[in-house]
């Protein structure tokens, strides 16, 4: 049993014998100073009024009761105005090893998510180019978060939303089409915002190699063909990059399918019937202000084209229709202003605002020896996720992406990540693991074998302060894993390891 859980059970027994209720404001937490014990509690302070006695007097009675009834405690002391400082016996901490041994890979698993279906949508980059390092951070956070939630008992489905409709996709088709015409020696006029990446030229050349007569098509047909081929080529590349990064989405959901199957229009009709939409200036608007947004939002523009928001409402409605109790979206921090309107949309389709969680991912600054690397595709400069993974490896890249809170800016120093020094958090953790494996290897070479089951008698020498501190640290993992799931904060695991 976890130390906090064990102590709470003992405290509850003491209160029951005193005919006192468990107070809502009771806290049991690790002591700020190890000299003052393993755990500290304010139980006497928050129970004094109900007991009708001064906090220190009540604390003294509780301490005496604990000393007499709980043999796993080495000491219980009263401090300050009535705090209780508790130190567990070495035997209690050594029992932690038995629990870890018995649970094996399941050690730390929780059941807080049992019976709850969660969808985690992450990355969802427009298929207009290869994934960059910002997408890599989102991939690492989303994938790790899904793993943590599963570990906590949630039924998790991971999903990638393919933005294959709208202006950006039309622009992709146009960019490839113009490059193809240029390769054919046809003069073209370039729009200001076309896609300039060298990958566009590669796709156009590939299409021309397969179909030399491509540019004889009409502009409309040529752009459509270039869009379809280009999007699929880029999407295949994205999937391959994610596989190399050990990220596998269970579902790939097409935005275009929402439009083609009438889901967007159906959503419009529902909003209209609920009195949550209105026409103004030839456009269709959603009354998001009814749900606390700072202004109403356009769903369909005056030219008849749909906004991204329109598709996003239909998409989130579809998520809940598929039976998910909770939806987690992992977005770039530049979408922070989008959160209130999506919360409004979720409520408009009949869900609670808290049924949608949004994890924001801040920018990644790529550095080389402390100097920022320009984000371009020129030779020798790293921009894409594939480039970074090739340079430092999957493990190092994933760990670095998770080494800070997701909503904090991250400096990713390529030189530091490759350093074999304690300044490199990746090396620090890997080195600790290597040392442990080395101890086990040398023990085997010396003919020492570990018993199949933990023999507590063999652990008696583990009584030094450093030994007990390590056991206490291992005991904390259950709370760390559970807390990471509840807070949607994968970095809690990284911090624990560091």
Where are the predicted features?
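Short, charged, solvent-exposed linker or helix-capping segments at domain edges/interfaces
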Residues: 95-100
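Non-catalytic interaction-recognition regions
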Residues: 1-94, 105, 109-498
């Amino acid at each position: 049993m976890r130390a906090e859980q064990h102590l709470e059970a003992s405290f509850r027994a003491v209160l029951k014998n005193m005919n006192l209720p468990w107070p809502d404001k009771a806290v049991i937490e690790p002591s700020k100073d190890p000299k003052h014990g393993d755990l500290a509690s304010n139980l006497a302070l928050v129970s004094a009024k109900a007991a009708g006695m001064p906090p220190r007097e009540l604390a003294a009675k509780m301490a005496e009761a604990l000393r007499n009834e709980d043999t796993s405690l080495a000491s219980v002391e009263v401090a300050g105005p009535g705090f209780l400082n508790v130190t567990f016996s070495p035997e209690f901490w050594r029992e932690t090893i038995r629990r870890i041994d018995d649970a094996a890979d399941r050690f730390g698993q929780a059941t807080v998510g049992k019976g709850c279906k969660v969808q985690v949508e992450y990355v969802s980059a427009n298929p207009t180019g290869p994934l960059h390092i910002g997408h890599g951070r989102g991939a690492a956070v989303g994938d790790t978060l899904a793993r943590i939630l599963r570990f906590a008992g949630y039924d998790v489905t991971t999903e990638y939303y393919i933005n294959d409709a709208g202006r950006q996709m039309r622009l992709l088709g146009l960019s490839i089409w113009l490059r193809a015409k240029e390769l054919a020696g046809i003069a073209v006029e370039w729009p200001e915002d076309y896609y300039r990446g060298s990958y566009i030229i590669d796709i156009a050349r590939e299409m021309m190699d397969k179909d030399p007569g491509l540019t004889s098509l009409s502009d409309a047909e040529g752009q459509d063909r270039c869009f379809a081929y280009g999007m699929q080529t880029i999407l295949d590349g994205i999937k391959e990059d994610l596989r190399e990064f050990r990220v596998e989405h269970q579902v790939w959901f097409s935005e275009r399918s929402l439009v083609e199957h009438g889901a967007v229009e159906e959503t419009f009709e529902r909003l209209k019937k609920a009195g949550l939409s209105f026409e103004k200036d030839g456009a269709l608007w959603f009354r998001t202000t009814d749900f606390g947004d700072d202004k109403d939002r356009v769903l369909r523009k005056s030219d008849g084209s749909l906004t991204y928001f329109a598709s996003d409402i239909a998409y989130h409605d579809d998520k809940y229709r598929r039976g998910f109790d909770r939806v987690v979206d992992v977005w770039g921090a530049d979408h922070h202003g989008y959160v209130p309107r999506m919360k409004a949309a979720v409520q408009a389709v009949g869900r609670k605002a808290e049924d949608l969680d949004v994890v924001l991912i801040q920018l990644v600054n790529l550095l080389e020896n402390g100097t920022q690397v320009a984000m371009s595709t020129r030779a020798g400069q790293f921009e894409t996720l594939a480039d970074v993974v090739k340079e430092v490896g999957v493990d190092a890249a994933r760990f670095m992406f998770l080494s800070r809170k997701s909503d904090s800016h991250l400096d990713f120093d390529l030189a530091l990540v490759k350093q074999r020094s304690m300044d490199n958090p990746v090396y620090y953790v890997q080195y600790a693991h290597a040392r442990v494996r080395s101890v086990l290897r040398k023990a085997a070479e010396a003919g020492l074998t570990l018993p199949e089951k933990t023999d507590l008698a063999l652990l008696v020498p583990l009584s030094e302060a450093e030994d007990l501190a390590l056991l206490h640290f291992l005991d904390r993992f259950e709370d760390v894993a559970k807390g990471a799931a509840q807070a949607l904060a994968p970095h809690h695991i990284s911090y624990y390891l560091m």
